[in-house]
Amino acid sequence: MRPEGITSYLLASPRTSSAEHLTTTLAVIQPGGEQRIHSHRPEQVYFILEGRGLMTVGSETQRVGPGDCIFIPSGQPHGLKNDGPLTLRYFSAAASAYEPGHLEKTWALKSEAETA
């Protein structure tokens, strides 16, 4: 878990599968945790599986919960804070795939983590 109270699991990506243009993740944010505001070139969608929070995209912040799907345009600053009492889980998909080196900064593969 990162200091912000979020754990991200890399699912399909060019690094882990034969996907060439897509990166998918499952993220878990503990109560009070947050994904800090950041931006990247790929477009992205978040699909909230459970829990509730505050999603910021650009200058707009909205309350999100189970079943909500949020589109994040390319280059748009965004982040998600779990301000509820329960764990927040979401699935994300980004396309095109992240630029070379981006994934290595964020996710260590299990074999790399075991040898580090």
Predicted regions and their residues:
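Short beta-strand His + acidic residue motifs that chelate non-heme Fe in jelly-roll/DSBH
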Residues: R36-I37, M55-T56, I72, H78-P85
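Short, conserved beta-strand element in jelly-roll/cupin
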Residues: H21, L26-Q30, S39-M55, A93
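A short, N-terminal "cap"/entry segment at the start of jelly-roll beta-barrel domains
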Residues: M1-L22, K105-A116
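Short acidic-glycine-tyrosine-enriched beta hairpin
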Residues: S59-S74
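A generic "binding-loop/recognition-motif" signal
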Residues: G33, R41-P42, E60, Q76-P77, ...
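Short hydrophobic/aromatic-rich beta-strand segments that constitute the beta-sheet cores
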Residues: S8-Y9, M55-V57, L80, Y90
